[in-house]
Each structure stands twice: as structure tokens, then as C-alpha cells.
Amino acid sequence: MAKLKDMKLDILAFGAHPDDVELGCSGTIAKEISLGKKVGIIDLTRGELGTRGTVEIRNTEATKAAEILGVSVRENLDMRDGFFVNDETHQLEIIKMIRKYQPEIVLCNAIQDRHIDHGKGSKLVSDACFLSGLIQIKTEINGEAQRPWRPKVVYHYIQWQTIEPDFVVDISQFIDMKMKAVQAYSSQFYDPKSNEPVTPIASKNFLESIQYRAKDLGRLVGVEYAEGFTVERYVTVNSLGDLK
């Protein structure tokens, strides 16, 4: 099992589409990597139903964004954009990734959002995290049996829809890296020279709104920029001094 141990990550972030993770929690990812944590990203789909760009372009953009953030690994599960479901087949694909990388923390899509894939992806990953710890569920990769593994916690980042966070992470020193990673997806966002249709995320003020939300969350906790998360169960601290 040494091979699996070598692949162990501290944090594994899932997104229904390439760019979900960057938009929702890339500041936090950059911060954790700077602290020595190993982080990976798993995209569920290629975003093939997106109005702008192509699958090939988005693949290149996802690779560029991963390099900017410095993540250890990025994979895509090739689920059907818009039509993946929360069933055994899809759960097993997630379980294989969880057991392969054995993360302590999983980050995933918002619990509900404008895009239906976000809520679906959120529940799919959350359910798979629980099931991954059950010894009677057997999986293997490349002919090698996998051990059960259940992440300690699952946190949901916030996307289009405004959701009250349960906690926030100070990303003041990493807002520039976050925006650089987001802007790696140039096919998806505002370009005055583009002849492609204008979409909600390709509107002129969208990138400004991403930075504004981070600034507003930061304002509420006395820092310059922050990202918010929701939790599935109570968060434990060792002492009141851990809270700010």
C-alpha cells in the first residue's frame, strides 16, 4: 500500500465543473498549500454544456489554473455535464478518488445554487464521503484493492447564490492568486472582443462581484478578504482561543 500512501492528500476539493473550485475556494486552497498542505482537485464533468469555449479549451484552462495554485493533482471524472445523478455508479467513482487520495478534509460545491449541478454535486460527494468509510463496499484501481477511507470533515464552499457561511477563511494574502486562477478560464468570462453569447458569468461585472463578495465577507470579520463555507456538523475547536 506504499503506493497509495505516497498519493495521500490533506485536502481534496471537488467541483461539478472546471472553474467551480477556483471561484468558490481557491484562496483557501492557495493558503493551505502555502502552509505545507497537499491539495488536489477533482472535476466531475468537463463542462461540455457550457455556452462559451470548448472542452479542449477548458481542459487547458483547468491545467493552467492548477499550476497557478500549485495543487498536487487534478483529475476529471468525465461525468455528463447537466445529467450526472447521485446513484451507486457515480458514488463509486467518487469513492475511488477518496480512497485513492485519503484526504482529511473534503471541499465541495454549494449545498444549493443557481446551477442544478452544484447542488447535485454537493450531495453526491457528501454521500460518497460517508459510503467510502464502509468496509463492505469494495473498490479497486488498476487491479489494486482499496482500503475504506472516510474524510474527517466535509465543507461546502459558496458559489452564485448568497448563503450564510458557518465559518470564513482569511484569504487576504491570497486574493490575487485566487483571481489569477479564476482568470485562467478566459473563455468563460467577459471579453469585449468575443463574439460568443453573453452569459451570467461572462457579464462585465462578474469578476468584480467575486472579489467584492470576498471583500464583504472579510469586512464582516475584520480582514481584507475571506471565503465562506458551510458545514454538515458542528465544528470542534480545542479552546475558545482558537476562535477569532
What are these regions (language model features)?
Residues M1-Y101, T230, L240-D242:
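Active-site rim/loop-helix segments in enzyme catalytic domains that contact anionic ligands
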Residues A2-L12, E88-K244:
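Metal-dependent de-N-acetylase/amidase catalytic core
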